[in-house]
């Protein structure tokens, strides 16, 4: 049986694996986890510097009152959740967020807005903040996550100095209607294609534990491969009280490791980022996940606190991994 995993590794390294082989990884017995992690880490080493690891950070730049009904989200206006609701913060606070990111070692900083799409006025304010970050020579790459913004706005953000846009597909096209009804999966897909047309780097991720099947997970992994996205944030559902998914059962850590491995075997040259829910889901297996990935989101999430940054520092130190410097990322 072990030879099958080595054969899949060789196929992934030299060509591409099939959906059946991807499902084989997900359905593997738990006793093969050490071998799966080893081969996945080995595959990562073929395309990346195995000793380098990146931190990224975000700011909840506009919070709550979102018009969309994403069943996993605390910021939807459809659910009564205990979050702060506010409009886009001012330029000074956006700049301060970049400085905080640098202070705890982040190389990328994403300004995230709750809404279906940022308004023209909001895009202008984001541009002003990015220009100020550049003017102050703050050594961090700036990313934006602002919904289904159009090509014209994307070009403005690029001109201001934004290097990457985040827009998540979240789950497979087949399962998406079970999670969101106020917009379509294809609308999100079109946004990613517009990001690529604008010549910006693409960051598009997934949330696991929404109720999707292994087949849904594999389907989305192949979509990202076909798109050629640069970075894939891997999130694990953190059930939020008063949302439709509040009672969803958390994923097992070992299943999460298999999912990460499967995404790496399909998207071998994409950056894989450990993001929301990593603390609760991975637990003591955090280090194994880090060996298979390139980066993690540090310093907290949109409406939830993250892991103590000192624990992430210690984890990388124990694994003999080096954080990417700002100069290596801000090219």
Curated annotation (Swiss-Prot):
Q: Which NCBIfam families match?
A: bioB
Q: Which domain of life is it from?
A: Bacteria
Coiled-coil blocks: none
- Protein family according to the UniProt entry: Belongs to the radical SAM superfamily. Biotin synthase family.
Task: Please describe the quaternary structure of this protein.
Answer: Homodimer.
Residue sites binding [4Fe-4S] cluster per the record: 66, 70, 73
Q: In which pathway does it act?
A: Cofactor biosynthesis; biotin biosynthesis; biotin from 7,8-diaminononanoate: step 2/2
> What EC numbers are recorded for this enzyme?
2.8.1.6
Required cofactor names:
[4Fe-4S] cluster; [2Fe-2S] cluster
Q: Name one GO biological process term.
A: biotin biosynthetic process
Q: What gene does this protein come from?
A: bioB
This entry's comment on the bound cofactor is: Binds 1 [4Fe-4S] cluster. The cluster is coordinated with 3 cysteines and an exchangeable S-adenosyl-L-methionine. Binds 1 [2Fe-2S] cluster. The cluster is coordinated with 3 cysteines and 1 arginine.
**Catalyzed chemical reaction(s):** (4R,5S)-dethiobiotin + (sulfur carrier)-SH + 2 reduced [2Fe-2S]-[ferredoxin] + 2 S-adenosyl-L-methionine = (sulfur carrier)-H + biotin + 2 5'-deoxyadenosine + 2 L-methionine + 2 oxidized [2Fe-2S]-[ferredoxin]
Q: What is this protein called?
A: Biotin synthase
Record-linked InterPro entries: Aldolase_TIM, BATS_dom, Biotin_synth/BioAB, Biotin_synthase, Elp3/MiaA/NifB-like_rSAM, rSAM
What residues does [2Fe-2S] cluster bind to? 110, 143, 203, 273
Would I find Phosphoprotein among this entry's keywords? no
Keywords linked to the UniProt accession: 2Fe-2S, 4Fe-4S, Biotin biosynthesis, Iron, Iron-sulfur, Metal-binding, S-adenosyl-L-methionine, Transferase
Biological source species:
Hydrogenobaculum sp. (strain Y04AAS1)
According to its UniProt entry, what is the function of this protein? Catalyzes the conversion of dethiobiotin (DTB) to biotin by the insertion of a sulfur atom into dethiobiotin via a radical-based mechanism.
